[in-house]
Amino acid sequence: SYLYWNMILEPWGRSTWGDPQNAMVTVDPGQKRAVFNPDFYVMKHFSNPIRPDAVRLGIKGHMAADSLLFRNPDGSYVVEAFNPFPEEKDLIVELEGERLSFTLAGESFNSMILQK
């Protein structure tokens, strides 16, 4: 499980102890407008395909520092992969004897659901 401390703040929001904070959603009360910030979309990547009781599995290789692998209770796998580089990168996933290749766009965050 994960707890996101500041889900919604005003622009240039501060914590209760006065430190500047980021939030998933910024709400400007003067304009009555909500802005969905990058953290919101990262949370969406994780919360949508990864189901309750999923298990995080080990991962290795050149993209391991920027990738996570989960097995959902239904047997599907979820790969979450971040490409911090400006150029495309190939991600190769080997699961149950099968080799799959994905091209990650530069500076992108990716969610892949792999069915058995």
Locate each region found by the language model.
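Short conserved micro-motifs at the rims of enzyme active sites and ligand-binding pockets
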Residues: 13-16, 90-93, 114
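Carbohydrate-binding surface patches
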Residues: 45-48, 59-96, 107
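Aromatic/acidic polysaccharide-binding cleft in carbohydrate-active enzymes
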Residues: 1-41
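Loop/turn elements at helix/coil->beta-strand transitions in domains of secreted/extracellular proteins
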Residues: 1-2, 52, 75
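C-terminal beta-strand-rich structural cap/linker in extracellular carbohydrate-active enzymes
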Residues: 103-116
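Surface-exposed loop/edge segments in extracytoplasmic proteins
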Residues: 98-101
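Edge strands and adjacent loops of beta-rich recognition modules
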Residues: 50, 54-56
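Acidic carboxylate-rich catalytic motifs and surrounding loops in phosphoryl-/glycosyl-chemistry enzymes
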Residues: 5-7, 57-61
